[in-house]
């Protein structure tokens, strides 16, 4: 299974691709897309859409795992993140790739075992799990963490699907 993890943001959008399953995951690619604040909003969104669509076409992931950010204290930040989130959803819909959202606590629990893990613990676990020596960007690290979280949740999703099919 190939999973694209997405840490949504307008100024910085993290993307990370992993392949494998919960027992053995392999790093394929990661990047942090950056848009300039001087760019007009349509140009920023277009750039993000084009790059996400390009990765979807090139790697053909089976799923996308995106951070579900429930609460933002600053309305303007929430609005901008929401626009980036929407652009990713559009690219996924156009490519026919299902999206799965995970909250920050789910990611922390999945990778570290506690919902109170800090950023350094997450980065350490991503690097250790994928055998990456250098990971310079927090947004890309978050994206890879989301992809790994999705892989970890796959056995539970499969069991739930089988149970639902038996009940029907």
Swiss-Prot record:
Q: Which cofactor does it need?
A: Mg(2+)
Record key words, sorted: Cytoplasm, DNA damage, DNA recombination, DNA repair, DNA-binding, Endonuclease, Hydrolase, Magnesium, Metal-binding, Nuclease
Which reactions is this enzyme annotated as catalysing? Endonucleolytic cleavage at a junction such as a reciprocal single-stranded crossover between two homologous DNA duplexes (Holliday junction)
Listed GO molecular functions? crossover junction DNA endonuclease activity; DNA binding; magnesium ion binding
Q: Its Enzyme Commission number?
A: 3.1.21.10
- Gene Ontology biological-process annotations: DNA recombination; DNA repair
Write out the catalytic residues in the record. Answer: 7, 67, 139
What biological function has been recorded for the protein in this entry? The RuvA-RuvB-RuvC complex processes Holliday junction (HJ) DNA during genetic recombination and DNA repair. Endonuclease that resolves HJ intermediates. Cleaves cruciform DNA by making single-stranded nicks across the HJ at symmetrical positions within the homologous arms, yielding a 5'-phosphate and a 3'-hydroxyl group; requires a central core of homology in the junction. The consensus cleavage sequence is 5'-(A/T)TT(C/G)-3'. Cleavage occurs on the 3'-side of the TT dinucleotide at the point of strand exchange.
Family statement: Belongs to the RuvC family.
Name by which UniProt lists this protein: Crossover junction endodeoxyribonuclease RuvC
Q: Which organism is it from?
A: Deinococcus geothermalis (strain DSM 11300 / CIP 105573 / AG-3a)
Q: Which gene encodes it?
A: ruvC
